[in-house]
Amino acid sequence: MDVSNENANSSIMTMEANFFMCIIVVFTQVRPVNNPESSAYLFSGFCRHTHKNACFFSFDFFQLVFDASSFAIPATLFYKYTKVTNINMKNITKNQIRMILLSSYLLSLIVGVIYVITYEPDESLEVASETRKFHSTQYDFRYYADITGYQKHFWSWLATNLNMISIFVPPIMSIVFIRLIQIKLNSLKHLFTDKTAAQAKKFDLALTIQTLVPAVCVIPIYIAHLILENYDLPFLSNFEKVLYMMLSLPTAIDAFIVIVTITPYQKAFIAFFKDTFCGKKVSPAIVRRNNISAVSIF
């Protein structure tokens, strides 16, 4: 009886250990090494510069999501620009929809294809075997780059530079689109009522936040990351956690900004719940002045 209880307790403890290890893996980007001679950990940060197949891990999937979401913001601004340039437009054209979707997800699809065609699980075992000859008890990937040479590999170079495009290009695109939108709105001021003008200011503020938050969160943090990872600094693994959070922040707050500050999104959001629970619909706001119909874009 005692033996069965001990086995049950041992099984529960093992399950708890595995559960907490999964939590650690997901939230700290760390995983244990399957090596009886060592209890060290592999940090995905330096692993990315060593051999992708040895660390095809959560950062890679996170990067794919970020590649898509980072271009989604300027794609949204492009849609807003098309609305501003044609205030009587009721529906966006199919070609514009295709362009928005393509510009949002093309880069992440390319990087994803690179990951798929270059991923070979057996190579991770070969890397572990080769590096164990030189560092039998110390599994810090900073020591492995010279052995594998993957940092200079074409696929590594291509994926790294494509990911850098997703860091630096979208904020620049967003700034260009928001400036074009502001210029167009200024040219339409004579059509605005007082209420519409107030909505335009709120709309402009929302677009500014959408543009500045990614630029402030992403570019300085990522540049600091690129600089710091060239040095052997003990806090770098913790700094990478900050990097992940800062990279995800624009995406996390983008939907909130849109719903709170842009009227049609508010109406659509409220209408969704009214349709769901009350069966009522909210009609779109239309501004009419000087015999010109302008569907509210704010």
UniProtKB/Swiss-Prot annotation:
Compartments where found: Membrane
Protein family (similarity comment): Belongs to the nematode receptor-like protein srd family.
Protein name (Swiss-Prot/TrEMBL): Serpentine receptor class delta-34
Keywords: Membrane, Transmembrane, Transmembrane helix
A Pfam family it matches: 7TM_GPCR_Srd
Superkingdom in the source lineage: Eukaryota
Transmembrane stretches, start-end: 10-30, 54-74, 99-119, 158-178, 207-227, 242-262
Gene3D superfamilies according to UniProt: Rhodopsin 7-helix transmembrane proteins (1.20.1070.10)
Its membrane topology: Multi-pass membrane protein
Organism for this UniProt entry: Caenorhabditis elegans
InterPro entries named in the record: 7TM_GPCR_serpentine_rcpt_Srd, Nematode_rcpt-like_delta
